[in-house]
Amino acid sequence: MLMVISPAKTLDYETPPATPRFTQPEHLDHAQELIAQLRDFSPAQIAELMHLSDKLAGLNAARFGSWERPFNPSNAKQALLAFKGDVYTGLHAEDFSEDDFDFAQAHLRMLSGLYGVLRPLDLMQPYRLEMGTKLVNGRGKDLYAFWGERISAWLNQALAAQGDDVLLNLASNEYFGAVKRKALNARIIDTEFKDLKNGQYKIISFYAKKARGLMARYVIKERLTNPEGLKDFNYQGYRYSAEHSKADSLVFLRDQPLD
């Protein structure tokens, strides 16, 4: 079973990594192509393209300018440990054992507007480039056109490497939109996490994002390879709802946040 999650806007390059091990991203030539294009943008143009404040636009212009190969631990950090956001709060990889990192490396992928697909231990230099960015490029009008079917092909390679055909989608619609469902040699399992609010179960963004990370953590910690085991997920009060679920669309409900 292969999991995919979204990246995060917030990054942490200050905290020492929880493991000294690292790997190199497999698709840096494509990332470098985007970096070369983005370096031609002024901070004002970046602000307009990405809908950022002047301060954030300046920061990311500087990031694009300082991006360089080769990646090493002095200028980059493992992707799973560099991203900081609601998903990664739930995942909490800071306390992973080396065996946990091994399992994650085989079974978890992060989708990225700049890097395409990242493995957990892949070194990553800081960036901000959301998948939905309308960056006109040599392959089309946006990043979906830039990546085309390549992300799906790389996920197929990862599935084949583990001899499996199940993909657990824990990514947002924005990022999973870069995956061509029909091109995947996989059974795709989608998930929804709903919390009780005003008498109804609803998707609450903050909690749903964190729950995706919790589910990824659950799979890693339990070494799950059979999707049937997903139904036993019970972290922080969530429970599987057979009534609300379908075969490949699993719904988890929670009556009261425990965080």
Curated annotation (Swiss-Prot):
A GO cellular-component term linked to this record: cytosol
GO biological process, one term: response to hydroperoxide
Family annotation (InterPro entries): YaaA
Pfam families per UniProt: H2O2_YaaD
Family membership noted in the UniProt record: Belongs to the UPF0246 family.
Full protein name: UPF0246 protein Pmen_1032
Species annotation: Ectopseudomonas mendocina (strain ymp) (Pseudomonas mendocina)
